[in-house]
Amino acid sequence: MACLNVANFGPIKRIASTRKGLEERKVTMLIGPQGSGKSTLLKLLCACHWLEKAYAKGLLAQNAFQTADLLKHQFDYYRMASYEQEDTVIDFQGEVLHLSYRHGKLDVDFKQGGQPPAKLLYVPSERSLVSLMKDYKAMRKLPESLLDFMGDYDSAKKYMVGDLNLGLPATSARYDAGCDQMWILHSKNKTRLEEAASGYQSLTPLKLTVEWAGNLQGKEDGDSLEERMARMKQRKLNATDASFGFLNFVEEPEQNLYPDAQVRVLNFLLSMANLRSQNKLMVTTHSPYLLNALTLAVKAGQILQVKKTAGKNMVRILPLKAAILDDDYAVWQLDEKGVVRKLEDFHGLPLDENFLNTAMGKFNSDFGKLQELEDEN
């Protein structure tokens, strides 16, 4: 189990709750207000896993870790260079590396016999832009993480066979390779992705690319040689044996989607995480619907452990493939002060007292106060 401890980096001041910091689980969810550091944590996790994988695959030798430039390049890659402070601390305990960054100095311990890292996919919040930018390779001012995701999306389209089920009623996506055009099919209508609703523009790249990466069996991305070295290495890392698992980092799966569709997307992501025991899913969210959907998935896992026959009726509520064990998830909440805390559980389920439910509760409270004003004489 990988762990990440962070202090004084961007909006993040410290990680409370445990001495090890944030401990990854099969499913890790980050919740909190806008600008509290959810994406920062997600990017740091992905960056550290990328460095670990690059070392394990021989793309980075031990002497490459002698300076902090390697980690600082990751800050640049994710546009977090300005986040570093004089007292920044980053400590990552992985399978084959222990990275410790303090006062601008990087120390690394190399472990022996660790399990090779999994494939990595980072799905950025800006993913809806991919439908608007076909000539993305010429757009060097875009974030590198977004450019890499666009490259992954292009690769996924090449391997697309038939229509892509978007998990929504009577809706699918179809790719026309001849004119490099993605279409959204809804009932009898056919719409170009770039002209479709914003929810489709966010959902289609996410679902197609995650399915491709999660099922990738050693396929190389031919376009990677045209990218600069950082991107080329990223491509090679993702062309690995799928038996080593799949690490999926997703920003805001709920983006531009109706609540019911948000739940469907999370169930899809959970199902992909359950394809292999080594797979992991890490997501950021502002949505109470996703947290509630995760709670349902955990409860389903609890029931299936003791009552196997419950699955016949459970499929009416959620896909059985989305059910997870109660010790296979963790929810971490970030506050406006930059403190990260693990959300406690109640009988294995996420505690109701969290930021997202508090926001919903305040709405109900304010509505009640307005009703009281209305009833005053």
Where are these predicted regions, by residue range?
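Walker B catalytic acidic pair
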Residues: E251-P253
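Phosphate-coordinating catalytic segments in nucleotide- and nucleic-acid-processing enzymes
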Residues: M1-G10, L45, H49-F249, L320-N377
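Phosphate-binding P-loop
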Residues: T18-R25, L185, A239-S243, A273-R276
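Conserved H-loop
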Residues: N248, N279-Y289
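Conserved hydrophobic alpha-helix in the ABC-type ATPase nucleotide-binding domain
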Residues: R264-L269
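Pre-Walker A-like glycine/lysine-rich segment at the N-terminus of P-loop NTPase domains
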Residues: M1-C46
